[in-house]
Design a protein with these regions (language model features):
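Flexible beta-alpha connector loops of hexameric P-loop NTPases
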Residues: 26-35, 77-88, 150-158
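Conserved Walker A/P-loop ATP-binding site and its immediately adjacent core
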Residues: 1-18, 37
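Conserved interdomain linker/interface between the two RecA-like ATPase lobes of SF2 helicase motors
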Residues: 91-167
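A short beta-strand-to-loop transition that corresponds to the Sensor-1 phosphate-sensing loop
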Residues: 7-8, 56-58, 74, 109-112, ...
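Conserved motor-coupling elements within RecA-like helicase/translocase cores
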Residues: 17-53, 64-67
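SF2 helicase catalytic motif II
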Residues: 51, 58-106
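Switch/connector loops and helix/strand junctions flanking conserved nucleotide-binding motifs
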Residues: 11-14, 36-39, 62-63, 78-81, ...
Length: 167
């Protein structure tokens, strides 16, 4: 399994959760590690000694012998987008890898990206699972997409839809 977190700072708590379940088969990969540390983790994954990789977007490229699951935590975060060459979005690479290997792909977010929401509507392979309440028990907020082209077509010059202004 590959588990992506948007920030290196989130790695320790995520790693500890997975280590409590999977023990020493969990590898960690991120850019703050030395080249030697990254190589050791990469090699342990390649040899099958580590079966779960937790890290930032570069963790996607670990040589997993068998890949059954990819999890992207907080999939809406912009940090999953690589701006310098080679340019890629970790979500798109993960989707391609999952399709190619038959792995399950789980995108987690309380506020999913528009791209992911759209894909769930138009692609039968993508399914949206909505939790009815938050972890703290509070209800989820109502979310609606408003068509600003219609607002402007009605002569509005505001950057906020009338529906937002009325509430």
């Amino acid at each position: 399994a590959i588990v992506l977190v948007p920030e290196i700072a989130l790695s320790p708590q995520t790693v500890s959760r997975f280590e409590s379940r999977f023990g020493d088969t969990v590898a960690v990969m991120h850019s703050r590690m030395t080249a030697g540390e990254r190589f050791d983790q990469w090699e342990a994954v390649r040899l099958g000694k580590k079966r779960v990789v937790v890290g930032a977007r570069s963790a996607l490229f670990c040589p997993m012998a068998t890949l059954g699951l990819i999890i992207i935590d907080e999939e809406h975060e912009s940090t999953y987008k690589q701006e310098s060459a080679p340019r890629y979005h970790a979500r798109d690479v993960a989707a391609w890898m999952a399709q190619r290997t038959g792995a399950a792909l789980v995108l987690g977010s309380a506020t999913p990206s528009i791209e992911t929401l759209c894909r769930c509507k138009v692609d039968d392979m993508w399914h949206r699972v909505v939790l009815p309440t938050r972890a703290n028990g509070k209800p989820m907020p109502e979310v609606r997409i408003l068509d600003m082209a219609k607002e402007f077509g009605r002569g509005s010059r505001s950057m906020f839809a009338k529906e937002l202004q009325d509430n």
